[in-house]
Amino acid sequence: MAELPTAPNGVSSGDYLHRSIDQLRSLTHLTTADLRTAQLVHDYKPFNINEFRQNVVERLDYSLKNGLVHHQQQQQQQQQQEMLQQQQQHQAHQEQQQQQQQQQQQHHHQQQQHHLKSSYSAPSSPPTPHEQQEQKYDPNRSPQRPLMSSGSNASSPEDDRRGSGGGPGGGGGGDGDQSKPYKCASCSKSFANSSYLSQHTRIHLGIKPYRCEICQRKFTQLSHLQQHIRTHTGDKPYKCRHAGCPKAFSQLSNLQSHSRCHQTDKPFKCNSCYKCFADEMTLLEHIPKHKDSKHLKTHICNLCGKSYTQETYLQKHLQKHAEKAEKQQQRHSSQVAAVQQHVPSGGIGLNLQRQAMNDVNAAYWAKMGADSAAASLAEAIQQQLPQTNGQTYANFATLQQHQQQQQQQQQDMLQQHHQRLADTPGHSHSPHEDPAGEDLVLRQTTPQHHLQQQQQQQQPSPGPGSSAFTPLSATVPPSHLQQHRGAPAATAAYLYQQNAAAAAAAFPTQLISLHQIRNYAHQPGAAGLIAGDHLTLGLSAVQAAKEKAQ
């Protein structure tokens, strides 16, 4: 092997780097010139170990520095992660606090409802038995199912959807008890949720917390209030989807009932629940299901015939009838009060005087006897009776009956008066010989008086329908008018035809004196028929006739 050349400056050969065997082999083939060029190319330099160690230390320091920076970056990342975790924990803690507050509010609300239920007394409608006390719900004890009245078992459609008693899935079976453990203590219904049970118990307790701000009507459930508000706003969100049908409804149940009318494949409809069936046999099988059902309108109004499904609805309807009757009575009393304000304190007597002053006829008094004058006064009193009796007799039928009774009494009194006159010893039965103290009209012996009576007998009497004294036509004629008994049965006893020309000439000699009126008033038969207020009518009529004759 060729020896390696020694390094200059007395440096030992161990201080140089040794070449590999291949390099040495390649160097042997090179010339000296080539070696020089190779030395220049490879630039062989002597390497000092101290310098190498120093470089190594610097490299180690650099690596340490790089490691510290990386460690610091990791620490910063960890700190950021910890901060994020703390923020998340803080947010979770806030959410927990909010949930706790909500739970506390719910618990407080439930306590208030429980306090209201415990302190609330059940109203009269729906009716509940007096001997049974209110029972509160306790899930630990077995439910008691007392027999309640029909009004207390009232339930809403939502209660029927949430739970039903006695049927499949209700409170009567074993599977229903497991799926719906919350049972009502007042009825046989059961529910799957306690909130549904609390809403249902409001029906039995009569609690209606939801009030309409427009009409102040109260409801047990919020959904019922929302449906009721649509009646005020006119909102109808449920529209019929049938082609060409523009109808819309405020409630879904009404739309469902309406949609059945478009079903052509099911022509047989149930009148109780509006369900439709394809054949008649299925409908006949369905109808018995409504027996003892809440759909039947068994509560009927005796006044108008309307029927309702619940007794409470019938009571509200009857209350409307009572309010209407009260309003009619108030209106009638106000009308009577208005009439009384226009009538003076004289009452009926003054009204009779006004009527006599306006309608007096001189010939009428000239041809009247005592009986006809009394009959005219009685008829005038009868004409004024509806004004006075209208205050006390609100019913027209009773008023008419009362008037008939008074007419009958007056007729009886007239008959008694005529009988007394007939039984008088000095009484004459001739129509031309009247005593001076008996009648209101003076005794007439003039030829004009006989002429008038002959004309009255010759003139045909009108029918009973045209007479002003129809109520007295059926009475027995008095004893001093026996000449009329030969007349036909249709003629009246007190019918006179007026002759204005003869009466106007004969009237001044036929005036009534005041002492004769007083004597007539003091007679035993006439005192009960004509009062002192009505006797003033004759005097006022006489004065008016005098003025007219002058």
UniProtKB/Swiss-Prot annotation:
Example of a GO cellular component annotation carried by this entry: nucleus
GO annotation terms (biological process): cell differentiation; nervous system development
Sequence ranges of Basic residues compositional bias: 106-117
UniProt similarity note: Belongs to the krueppel C2H2-type zinc-finger protein family.
Modified residues (Phosphothreonine): 424
Descriptive protein name: Zinc finger protein squeeze
The organism's place on the tree of life at top rank: Eukaryota
A Pfam family assignment: zf-C2H2
Start-end of Polar residues biased regions: 141-156
Spans annotated as Disordered: 73-179, 399-485
Molecular function via GO: zinc ion binding
Positions annotated as zinc finger (C2H2-type): 182-204, 210-232, 238-262, 268-290, 299-321
Chief place of localization: nucleus
Alphabetical UniProt keywords: Developmental protein, Differentiation, Metal-binding, Neurogenesis, Nucleus, Phosphoprotein, Repeat, Transcription, Transcription regulation, Zinc, Zinc-finger
Organism taxonomic ancestry: Eukaryota, Metazoa, Ecdysozoa, Arthropoda, Hexapoda
Record gene name: sqz
Modified residues (Phosphotyrosine): 494, 496
